[in-house]
């Protein structure tokens, strides 16, 4: 498949004057829903990948292969530019290079590489940051692994919540100088924090689920933020829906009394049944059941 168009569309958005909220997606159906509702891009988080693929918490036990395969499934289902959280690149700088190669092949439009020391080491009390020099090496490796120059490489740091504003700025400026296309910050809670960073760096900014006072698109746009996450509520809502439906059925509720379900029309839309009906008529001289 040709992934060029979606990467170009994402770069157009990043170069534009406004911040966007991407839709949080995790599989083919959720990506199609986001696309049908008009989201300009989708976001596939590492935590959600672990939940979806393994049923495991966000403790970095998912492999690159598993992550790339799920990203490909999402990408082939539609045309939504997909941003993905590639965590620490699944190892050292050499692993980062391969991570970029695999995710580019899977069709992603953008990926983040972070400077957190992952997975958590023996005896560690919590996450730590790798040295800036090591982070720069990872960013350079990511750029070296990229074949399609339209693929957006995002340098990410969680320093704001660990070491503060000054270290965040130092790290982001180093990654900017290394040549990444965009800068991602996790843990930003106040406007003062964002203002300080926005004044210190030149590249477009990407925020990961910031504090409540920052959810103002006009303000974010004026601070050169071009992408801002709203958490990953769709997956959480889906888990709750499955839980409550199965709970009701287990308790003896008749299936016909379960009302909060997708309509047949919505199911046909998200499974692209009309496409398959057309292909069945064209290639099989047959009608698709239920069309």
Predicted regions and their residues:
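Alpha/beta enzyme core
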Residues: 2-232, 236-247, 283-291
